[in-house]
């Protein structure tokens, strides 16, 4: 299964739509905040093709999206958050505490605008970077394991 991971679109709706169209085999789209309005428009446009899971970011003032989502996808427990509540700009310590206490296999976060793919102590930590800058990510969950890939839209 391919999962598309997006974050920090910051009003760049075009980038959001291009990223979704660039990954036609993605079955699930995670949006990690700071662009809730664009996310809601993408859900409206693409929900007949893909499942959408979103969380709010620190810039998403008027949304009902949760700040944290934990669910099992393809037999892997995935935690999604924007990251500001876990102070990710100052390190991953708080995020790691949440991941371990919730027994997660994969942690998705944004906020820093910096792509990151890290495997530590049995947990994958993945930040797709800022979609406003053309960064996004995909995660492939296969029988062989988990592969996290940071990508660029190549539209700049």
Language-model features and meaning:
Residues 5-7, 29-34, 53-58, 79-82, ...:
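Active-site neighborhood of phospho(di)ester-bond hydrolases with catalytic His/Asp-centered motifs
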Residues 1-49, 60-62, 66-67, 141-144, ...:
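N-terminal active-site segment of His-dependent metallophosphoesterases
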Residues 44, 68-72, 115-117:
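Short secondary-structure boundary/capping segments
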Residues 10-14, 36-40, 59-64, 86-91, ...:
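Active-site environment of divalent metal-dependent phosphoester hydrolases
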Residues 90-99:
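Charged helix-capping and loop-helix junction motifs
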Residues 48-51, 123:
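A short helix->loop->beta-strand "cap" motif at the edges of active sites that frequently abuts
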Residues 2-3, 100-103, 120-156:
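Binuclear metal-dependent phosphoesterase catalytic core
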Residues 51-88:
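Helix-adjacent hinge/juxtasegments
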């Amino acid at each position: 299964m391919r999962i598309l991971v997006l974050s920090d679109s910051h009003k760049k709706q075009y980038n959001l739509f291009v990223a979704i169209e660039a990954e036609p085999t993605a079955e699930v789209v995670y949006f990690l905040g700071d662009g809730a309005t664009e996310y809601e428009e993408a859900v409206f446009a693409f929900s007949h093709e893909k499942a959408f899971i979103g969380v709010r970011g620190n810039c998403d003032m008027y949304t009902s999206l949760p700040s944290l989502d934990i669910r099992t996808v393809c037999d892997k427990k995935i935690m999604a958050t924007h990251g500001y509540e876990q102070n990710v700009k100052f390190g991953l310590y708080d995020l790691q505490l949440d991941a371990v206490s919730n027994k997660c296999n994969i942690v998705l976060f944004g906020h820093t605008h910096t792509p990151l793919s890290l495997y530590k102590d049995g947990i994958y930590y993945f930040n797709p970077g800022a979609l406003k800058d053309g960064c996004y990510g995909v995660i492939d969950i296969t029988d062989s394991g988990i592969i996290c890939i940071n990508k660029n839209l190549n539209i700049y």
